């Protein structure tokens, strides 16, 4: 696995057990999966944009993305039901740990005007969502081949019961939250 996973196994589990007074190691929250979603609204008129977004997401995650389709028709957006409008990847296991390590220590410091992550992005069940405006923060993306700046949503799903537990878990992973 990765250094981050070893750090979780050796340090974070013990720290969280003492902090929240867990009786078993199985009660300690862990990261279950990371979902990366890239919505391409302009793909309605230009199919090449969706192909490029899929390619970018594949390079970032190391896994082939699934094309997402519209659930229902919306005439004001010129979208029909079943029309492809984005792509997503769900990472688990070793790919998840590798992506998380690259995201925390390489990609996040490259975000322009970064002032820390918002604490308000927890969903109430211990999951955290981050919105990224540019895909070029990842070193795998070649800046010269980028045709359009595309954002993405990154959702970190944890086994934590409350937001406080998830916050403690992500802080232990050195997520830079705003004070």
Swiss-Prot record:
GO molecular function: rRNA binding; structural constituent of ribosome; tRNA binding
UniProt keyword list: Ribonucleoprotein, Ribosomal protein, RNA-binding, rRNA-binding, tRNA-binding
Pfam families on file: Ribosomal_L5, Ribosomal_L5_C
GO biological process: translation
PROSITE patterns: RIBOSOMAL_L5 (PS00358)
InterPro entries referenced in this protein's UniProt entry, alphabetically: Ribosomal_uL5, Ribosomal_uL5_bac-type, Ribosomal_uL5_C, Ribosomal_uL5_CS, Ribosomal_uL5_dom_sf, Ribosomal_uL5_N
Role this protein plays: This is one of the proteins that bind and probably mediate the attachment of the 5S RNA into the large ribosomal subunit, where it forms part of the central protuberance. In the 70S ribosome it contacts protein S13 of the 30S subunit (bridge B1b), connecting the 2 subunits; this bridge is implicated in subunit movement. Contacts the P site tRNA; the 5S rRNA and some of its associated proteins might help stabilize positioning of ribosome-bound tRNAs.
NCBIfam families per UniProt: PRK00010.1 (NF000585)
Name of the protein: Large ribosomal subunit protein uL5
Protein source organism: Blochmanniella pennsylvanica (strain BPEN)
């Amino acid at each position: 696995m990765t250094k981050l996973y070893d750090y979780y196994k050796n340090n974070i589990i013990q720290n969280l057990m003492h902090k929240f007074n867990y009786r078993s190691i199985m009660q300690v929250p862990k990261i279950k999966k990371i979902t990366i979603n890239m919505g391409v609204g302009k793909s309605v008129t230009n199919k090449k944009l969706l192909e490029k977004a899929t390619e970018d997401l594949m390079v970032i995650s190391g896994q082939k993305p699934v094309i997402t389709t519209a659930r229902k028709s919306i005439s004001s957006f010129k979208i029909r039901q079943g029309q492809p409008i984005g792509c997503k990847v769900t990472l688990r296991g070793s790919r998840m740990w590798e992506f998380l390590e690259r995201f925390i220590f390489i990609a996040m410091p490259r975000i322009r005007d970064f002032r820390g992550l918002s604490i308000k992005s927890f969903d109430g069940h211990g999951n955290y969502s981050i919105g990224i405006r540019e895909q070029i923060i990842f070193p795998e993306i070649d800046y010269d081949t980028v045709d359009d700046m595309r954002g993405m949503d990154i959702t970190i799903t944890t086994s934590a019961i409350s937001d406080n537990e998830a916050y403690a878990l992500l802080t232990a992973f050195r997520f830079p939250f705003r004070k």
